[in-house]
Amino acid sequence: MKYSFIIPVYNRPDEVDELLDSLTRQTIRDFEVVVVEDGSSIPCKDVVDNYADRLSIHYYNKENSGPGQTRNYGVERANGEYMLILDSDCILPENYLKEVEAELQYKKADAFGGPDRAHESFTDVQKAINYAMTSFFTTGGIRGGKKKLDKFYPRSFNMGIRKEVYQALGGFSKMR
């Protein structure tokens, strides 16, 4: 298996549903999904179970330890060569893996990240928050969505990393 999507989640079953739905639309299917519930009081297990017939999906529920440790927990259980780490509120375009695959064939990268932008269905408030987070006038220098190979500034809501590199680096910090 080439790719493992690692999805830490805390009290977001509706967003997990949207993300998993977007994964069913991927044009490349060589992936598994690892959903790790981080001690949620509003679990997403029923949502995950609804996708068991359409995705190679694994669900884990553990005590709350924060997003970094939850990502590490997921990576430990994943089988892919590349770990694609997403936040639970991501929605991927159907060509996401196709573009990742093309870039990895062109440039052999051990780690990579992608831009973020507001989905067209977002409310005006959500779009304003997105602007504040991605504008050149705020943090756009880091999160500005440039499409070029450059220094890697990890943003854990949309990042990929070769599993062996992740393990060599020790994963995410134990800090909360």
Predicted segment positions?
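N-proximal low-complexity "stem/linker" segments adjacent to membrane-targeting elements
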Residues: 1-25
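A structural helix-start
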Residues: 9-17, 37, 41-42, 93-94
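Glycine-rich, basic loop-to-helix element that forms the pyrophosphate-binding segment
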Residues: 62-78, 99, 153-157
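The conserved acidic donor/metal-binding loop of glycosyltransferases
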Residues: 87-91
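Conserved donor NDP-sugar-binding/catalytic core segment of glycosyltransferases
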Residues: 95-127, 131
